[in-house]
């Protein structure tokens, strides 16, 4: 495990409770049970619903991927202290289980907060999606997010990353980006996203910051859930 991931994992552990209530206005989906999160022992091979992960009472209907891989949907916000750390864990997992899972990223958006979706889809449209990861890491610090969340500063930041400022502004205000923002709002509501990071596995199971702060623990829980879905699909 790299020093960068260790440091970010420690930061995530210290701050994971700070993001627990951030999307209170959004309707939260009902989960099957609720328990307190914990870090299990090394010998733990079974994980408990409501403690290590959550499950939707009614799974989200999803179209099957043509490659048959299980979706891992990562809902994030740039105003998040632990999302970059969680992303590192998820990317690691998707690399070691590339034959089983597909990692998909979705910016969280509400009617009152569209910054993350607007910037994410602007970067995607400019073929600069990798800069989203850079921004997510930078804004792990609240002060940096506060600074960059203003129009002038984020445009200046984009220019510093090598993008054409005027093209960035034009794309940011384009109809296609506006439509993607609306889709993000609808998806945030459909999945009942109420905090960040918020990770949905196969439309059935959910991980939050209470699990996504330790790579060994997170990978073990992800393996447990992916294997669980595979067994359910065989029934």
Curated annotation (Swiss-Prot):
The answer to whether the entry has keyword Ribosomal protein is no
* Keyword Cell membrane among record annotations: no
Q: Which GO terms describe its biological process?
A: cellular response to antibiotic
Q: Where is the signal peptide?
A: 1-24
Instruction: State the CDD domains in the record.
Output: DsbA_DsbA (cd03019)
Keywords of the record, alphabetical order, are:
Signal
Instruction: Spell out the GO cellular component terms annotated for this protein, sorted alphabetically and separated by semicolons.
Output: outer membrane-bounded periplasmic space
GO MF term list: protein disulfide isomerase activity; protein-disulfide reductase activity
Q: What SUPFAM superfamilies does this protein map onto?
A: Thioredoxin-like
Which InterPro entries does this UniProt record tie to the protein?
Answer: DsbA/DsbL, Thiol_disulfide_DsbA, Thioredoxin-like_sf
Put simply, this protein is called Uncharacterized protein HI_1215
Q: Which organism is it from?
A: Haemophilus influenzae (strain ATCC 51907 / DSM 11121 / KW20 / Rd)
What are the top taxonomic ranks of the organism? Bacteria, Pseudomonadati, Pseudomonadota, Gammaproteobacteria, Pasteurellales
């Amino acid at each position: 495990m790299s020093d960068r991931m260790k440091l970010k994992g420690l930061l995530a552990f210290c701050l994971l409770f700070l993001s627990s209530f951030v999307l209170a206005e959004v309707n939260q989906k009902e989960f099957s049970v609720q328990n307190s999160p914990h870090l299990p022992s090394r010998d733990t091979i079974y994980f408990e619903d409501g403690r290590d992960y959550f499950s939707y009472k009614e799974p989200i209907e999803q179209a099957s991927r043509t490659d048959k891989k299980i979706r891992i949907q990562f809902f994030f916000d740039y105003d998040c202290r632990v999302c970059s750390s969680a992303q590192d864990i998820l990317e690691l997992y998707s690399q070691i289980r590339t034959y089983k899972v597909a990692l998909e990223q979705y910016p969280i958006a509400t009617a009152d907060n569209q910054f993350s979706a607007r910037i994410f889809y602007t970067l995607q449209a400019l073929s600069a999606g990798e800069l989203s990861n850079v921004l997510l890491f930078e804004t792990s610090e609240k002060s940096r997010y506060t600074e960059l969340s203003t129009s002038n500063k984020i445009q200046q930041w984009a220019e510093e990353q090598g993008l054409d400022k005027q093209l960035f502004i034009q794309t940011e205000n384009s109809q296609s980006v506006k439509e993607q923002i609306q889709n993000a709002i609808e998806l945030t509501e459909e999945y009942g996203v109420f905090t960040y990071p918020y990770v949905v596995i196969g439309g059935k199971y959910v991980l939050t910051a209470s699990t996504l702060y330790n790579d060994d623990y997170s990978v073990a829980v992800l393996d447990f859930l992916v294997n669980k879905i595979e067994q359910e699909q065989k029934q």
